[in-house]
């Protein structure tokens, strides 16, 4: 089992979808970067990598036992031992994990390009064990609050965050909005279909709106999201976190 030293990590906590664990080029100056003074590097199978990256479920027991207390976080002048932290690679992808003492991958991070290259070199020269899933890989269920990766493909970090904010607002609209309100917002999205929309019931209007906004991200999505969340304090706060300014 091999180790690395001085590894930069930018933890994304509680993320069950890999597209929210940002690559190095999307890290921001206000992200909290930490340094792993020492971290164990493990080889995993592609199915296990997918599981680690896109699930918040228990990790294999043999992996947890083998990495137990072998990694350290550097904080100020001290060295803090971590129960279950490691860098995993399937030979093509890399992710860092810290379970925060639990058995699930609570915190996840990408690495810098230079350190990713070092991982590949270390594993190339290491004929060590390859960890795999124990049993069948659970089927990943996607929904409006956990969108399919294809709906986020090609989007920037800011665009992904805003699209998920839009989905949160749409979910609230579906659960609390009446038929007329949903038809109103569908008309805002597609004003050219006004006459057709007036004949839609609650289900038809909602399905049409949700289906149409799922495609990509555009200036139209941006302004629609801004209008939809206006006056809703929680959503406006999330908007401000992405912009540094309030909803107009």
UniProtKB/Swiss-Prot annotation:
What family classification does the UniProt entry report for this protein?
A: Belongs to the UPF0736 family.
Q: Which HAMAP family match?
A: UPF0736
Q: What is the lineage of its organism?
A: Bacteria, Bacillati, Bacillota, Bacilli, Bacillales
Organism of provenance: Halalkalibacterium halodurans (strain ATCC BAA-125 / DSM 18197 / FERM 7344 / JCM 9153 / C-125)
Which superkingdom is the protein from? Bacteria
Q: Know the name of this protein?
A: UPF0736 protein BH2872
What Pfam families does this protein's entry cite?
DUF3603
Against InterPro entries, the record matches this protein to: UPF0736
